[in-house]
């Protein structure tokens, strides 16, 4: 019997092992995917290193030097004796910071440094993850800051669009441009949230590299371009209205639609073709390629044009204020106010702060400032151009007052009806059931008249 049970156990053991392995894979699919990605990166780097070692010319300079080598993670060139070679940390592991440095020492004898404990050649990777915890915390803070910013932007922009569409008296060309700009902000915010939560952080999706992932990246880049080109449309409209022709007739909005929604398709399509041919990485998610300038170049050009429009508009405003002979302080305050209102709409802050500073604290401050400027721009624009708009405030105030008056009248009317009905009902009940009344007439009306009044109480107000 025992032998029989042992045979059953041996027969079922492989199935139990399969179940355990499958359960482990279901519990930690991301770990297995990350391990596969890391292994592929290391194998690719190793292959490229050996190719480089064989193809590079032999060192011709005199003197002692350490030979080129592969240390298991990185490739090292020939180095003169007594020097220290340095390069950036690899991105194989999640806790490695590619901005930190790896060092490898070549001693005076032309041998790579050996660790005293293991007596093996050793490369110093200790700096790669020394500040990982702090940087991960900063990255998480920026991630949550981004999600909250886009969420608030979507909510405020949808409310603004609802106001613009509901109140027909606000309809004009300027509001039409605002509607399209706000809608582009909404689309861009929604796609950005999906990209950050469902694509960028989904290693399984990136590893499988479906076509839908690349299509989504194409849509993401296209909508980002639409966002900035609708900013350009706002700048062109304001410049035409204030500088070119103040008393001109209505402008043709068809060209604005083409520029805002149509033109961004051109760089987006060119980038997609170039990415497919020259840098076809998974989901086109990598930013380590100059092909992104196909998208960023037109955006920077649009922002520079908007910067010119802004400066010219401020110049015209200052000139007009000087003609009115107002006080100097008031003149500059109005010019500054106009500038501060235009800056968030036209996106000039990306031109004013284009360079990332060096230094840990400076970089962190820069990241927070840029994340606020970029991801809260929809909230800022909707606040300034809708909620702080005098016309919008006047219409909302007028409708709110009308609603309060109507609600108050309705409430007072219903209270009066209930009070009158209660009074008349009491009188009717007394007349019908009391034997103490000297006459069947009350207040000049008969009991039958009172019954009619109870049935039709609105007659009290005739």
Curated annotation (Swiss-Prot):
Residues 1-22 form the signal peptide. It comes from the Eukaryota. The record marks 287, 296, 355 as: Required for ADM2 interaction. Pfam families: 7tm_2 (PF00002), HRM (PF02793). The gene is CALCRL. It comes from Sus scrofa (Pig). This is Calcitonin gene-related peptide type 1 receptor. PANTHER family: CALCITONIN GENE-RELATED PEPTIDE TYPE 1 RECEPTOR, PDF RECEPTOR-LIKE PROTEIN-RELATED. GO terms for biological process: adenylate cyclase-activating G protein-coupled receptor signaling pathway; adrenomedullin receptor signaling pathway; angiogenesis; calcitonin gene-related peptide receptor signaling pathway; cell surface receptor signaling pathway. Residues 289-290 are annotated as: Required for RAMP3 interaction. Detected in lung and coronary artery. The chain crosses the membrane at residues 141-165, 177-199, 211-239, 254-274, 291-315, 331-352, 368-388. It is a multi-pass membrane protein. Its main location: membrane. Keywords: Cell membrane, Disulfide bond, G-protein coupled receptor, Glycoprotein, Membrane, Phosphoprotein, Receptor, Signal, Transducer, Transmembrane, Transmembrane helix. Heterodimer of CALCRL and RAMP1; the receptor complex functions as CGRP receptor. Heterodimer of CALCRL and RAMP2 or CALCRL and RAMP3; the complexes function as adrenomedullin receptor. The record marks 203 as: Required for ADM interaction. Residues 23-140, 200-210, 275-290, 353-367 are extracellular. Belongs to the G-protein coupled receptor 2 family. InterPro entries: GPCR_2 (IPR050332), GPCR_2-like_7TM (IPR017981), GPCR_2_calcitonin_rcpt_fam (IPR003287), GPCR_2_CGRP1_rcpt (IPR003289), GPCR_2_extracell_dom_sf (IPR036445), GPCR_2_extracellular_dom (IPR001879), GPCR_2_secretin-like (IPR000832), GPCR_2_secretin-like_CS (IPR017983). CDD domains: 7tmB1_calcitonin_R (cd15274). GO terms for molecular function: adrenomedullin receptor activity; calcitonin gene-related peptide receptor activity; calcitonin receptor activity. The record marks 289 as: Required for RAMP2 interaction.
